[in-house]
Amino acid sequence: MMVLVTYDVRTAETGGAKRLRRVAKACRDYGQRVQYSVFEIEVDPAQWTSLRARLEGLIKSEHDSLRYYFLGANWRRRVEHVGAKPALDLGGPLIV
């Protein structure tokens, strides 16, 4: 399944920058960054359960927020890209 994960972490307080880095790393471990606080993540249900628990354990819900957009099985037809940073097909062939 394809999930778009977005986050907003308050960095003005002590520990905020560290939480921001940890949230970004958790997302990077499962997907690709498409904007500063936006990741495209293609996971199976077990991986999603693990990532979601990890993310929600990292944030302070009174200051930070996470948003999940479930794009479904036909996500490639629903996503359009214009401009720099072309999309990477994580399921496609890898040429080394």
Please place each PLM-identified region on the residue numbering.
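Basic nucleic-acid-binding interfaces
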Residues: 3-4, 10-96
